[in-house]
UniProtKB/Swiss-Prot annotation:
Protein name per its UniProtKB record: Excelsatoxin A
Function: Neurotoxin certainly responsible for the defensive, persistent, and painful stings of the giant stinging tree. Inhibits inactivation of Nav1.7/SCN9A sodium channel in sensory neurons by directly interacting with TMEM233, a newly described Nav-interacting protein. Has virtually no effect on Nav1.7/SCN9A function in heterologous expression systems and in neurons that do not express TMEM233. Also weakly but significantly affects Nav1.8/SCN10A. Coexpression of TMEM233 with Nav also confers ExTxA sensitivity to Nav1.1-Nav1.6.
GO biological process: defense response
Tissue expr: Expressed in trichomes, that are stiff epidermal hairs located on the surface of petioles and leaves. Not expressed in other aerial parts.
N-terminal signal peptide: 1-20
Length: 73
């Protein structure tokens, strides 16, 4: 998980750097989404019987015994 996060940030920075080299005027239009920009769920776990535990911006993904709250992207 940590390797994927570091790889995603590195690629995003490389892309931003190559775009900035082409035109310094377009640097204001670049938006880089990071995991910190994702909405946070009210709870990490949920139940199919009480779906509202995740919050408004998250969805309950069912597993055999319990569910996981996943942010809506």
């Amino acid at each position: 998980m940590r390797f994927a996060l570091v790889a995603a940030i590195t690629i995003a920075l490389l892309v931003a750097g190559s775009v900035a080299d082409e035109s310094s005027e377009d640097i204001d239009n670049i938006v880089i989404k990071t995991p910190l920009d994702l909405p946070r769920c009210d709870s990490p776990f949920c139940s199919l019987f009480r779906i509202g535990l995740c919050g408004d911006k998250c969805t309950c993904v069912p597993l055999p015994i319990f569910g996981l709250c996943v942010p809506d992207v």
